[in-house]
Amino acid sequence: MDSSHQSNYKLSKTEKKFLRKQIKARHTLLRHEGIETVSYATQSLVVANGGLGNGVSRNQLLPVLEKCGLVDALLMPPNKPYSFARYKTTEESKRAYVTLNGKEVVDDLGQKIILYLNFVEKAQWKELRPQALPPGLMVVEEIISSEEEKMLLESVDWTEDTDNQNSQKSLKHRRVKHFGYEFHYENNNVDKDKPLPGGLPDICDSFLEKWLREGYIKHKPDQMTINQYEPGQGIPAHIDTHSAFEDEIVSLSLGSEIVMDFKHPDGTAVPVMLPRRSLLVMTGESRYLWTHGITCRKFDTVQASENHKSGIITSDVGDLTLSKRGLRTSFTFRKVRQTPCNCSYPLVCDSQRKETPPSFPESDEEASRLEQEYVHQVYEEIAGHFSSTRHTPWPHIVEFLKALPSGSIVADIGCGNGKYLGVNKELYMVGCDRSQNLVDICRERQFQAFVCDALAVPVRSGSCDACISIAVIHHFATAERRVAALQEIVRLLRPGGKALIYVWAMEQEYNKQKSKYLKGNRNSQGKKEEMNSDTSVQRSLVEQMPDMGSRDSASSVPRINDSQEGGCNSRQVSNSKLPIHVNRTSFYSQDMLVPWHLKGNPDKGKPVEPFGPIGSQDPSPVFHRYYHVFREGELEALCRTVSDVRILQSYYDQGNWCVILQKA
């Protein structure tokens, strides 16, 4: 029903419900995606809930739309819960608006979805993707015949005795078998002193000899891993350890096609189609610098045209659809390296780092030790330099503090150099920080501050009218400790008290806008480098989040454990090493170490540059701070686990996710 006609007669209960849903879809599209709808009829429509991100394929949606007229174009952006349709005439689009609004369709998983249509001025979408494969990457189609594929698949006995854990394992994400050497997923490496008996299967010899002759590989592999993936399974993004294997790594895809995601440290992402019976060859930059992984999902976004079988999935949204995954088996071949790696990518090379980064924490005790070394000690060392970069308060934080009633008692948990303690002279503000040196700077500025841990603040329960926690919670190394930090903040609040929380966002490009962190001067530094600009742009999110149990919304916000559904965990393989982030680039891991180049002559000793590349000409000591960057919706999901609190508002502010909470 057209909302412009609602005043002509009294709406029924069903019509009112539909109208609310349609308006909600319209507002969500505007807030989340910047898509503005219009109240008058045009040739173009945006179809909320009719997108590849909802599990609706081109083959499903197009026939539904064509019942109302000739569809000139159907644009389906990847991973989005909506699409754009342009009809030949405005009359046809009006017919679709009236006929299809509120229509129920069934997605590829058999779930019911309700479509909501709104007019837009133009059906358009621009998304630039690289038109070339990562350097050193090659996909060779039909490298083997269907008969050879059948022979290889039948040679794998998944029912054999699994007591020998050196050769076969059933992982959470997939089934694996190892030959030559066991591949250890906790460190993406092999034990070179413990080869497996039997070597590689004889059936592989003829294929390997052929690939050697044809130049696809330079070394005959002596290690092979067979992975079997059910639909919906995958493998986290990773780089095979440099020191473990020689340059080329090749993978043969059997049984089903798959889309593998490659990502450069600068954020460039390239989805690559690996057809059935194709050989993926990774050498050079694609092997050493780019991460590769398979996203856990049952459908891949692929080209709809028949002539596109392998290579990059382009950004032509007029030629994208969904492809249902099948049972895929991969044979991955590697040559074990016997000497240190001397590649051209020392920042990500384990052979060329002076020290080894720490592993992901597996317990609260390990997390505490990690925070002590890579958060607390670092800020003690860099406090002076850090404070010199912290001067201008952020506008939306100032707005929150100035809106509080005069005389309010406010605690700044993790106050740093006290940048916010003097913003509103009408408040009684007190700060606390884990760093003694930063607290001393606060006191030099005549602010009230003391040293404590954010998990145990020595302040009476219910004594604060408000709290702020700016760029602190992302330094806690486990979800449980992050929740505990939130609970401690809520404990301090009186009933009705409010808290403002900022954390660093995984999405440093949002609504097609890069954050100041990505655009900023690469030579500048800051404690929370995500918070180093004098201006900010706030992007409000939906304050009343849609019901996650319903597919009847234009978009949704993930719950805290969404990323773990289907056997995939957002964190990388347990015990794997924390990656070191390249400053001023997009994130490819949620948990990482972020470098800080200490400028000037530090008073305290001469700290050694940890994990720095051999031959580095930078005389500045480099420290590394632990961060967990938050995905969209993760902070809200974390807050929902805390009792006696509700979310008043959530928004995006220059590379940070932010919430305002109120205690019940």
From Swiss-Prot:
Function of the molecule: Catalyzes the methylation of 5-carboxymethyl uridine to 5-methylcarboxymethyl uridine at the wobble position of the anticodon loop in tRNA via its methyltransferase domain. Catalyzes the last step in the formation of 5-methylcarboxymethyl uridine at the wobble position of the anticodon loop in target tRNA. Has a preference for tRNA(Arg) and tRNA(Glu), and does not bind tRNA(Lys).
UniProt: Fe cation binding residues: 238, 240, 292
Regions crossing the membrane: none
Domain annotation Fe2OG dioxygenase: ranges: 220-337
Its EC number(s): 2.1.1.229
Name recorded for this polypeptide: tRNA (carboxymethyluridine(34)-5-O)-methyltransferase ALKBH8
Domain RRM intervals: 43-120
GO biological process, one term: DNA damage response
Provenance organism: Macaca fascicularis (Crab-eating macaque)
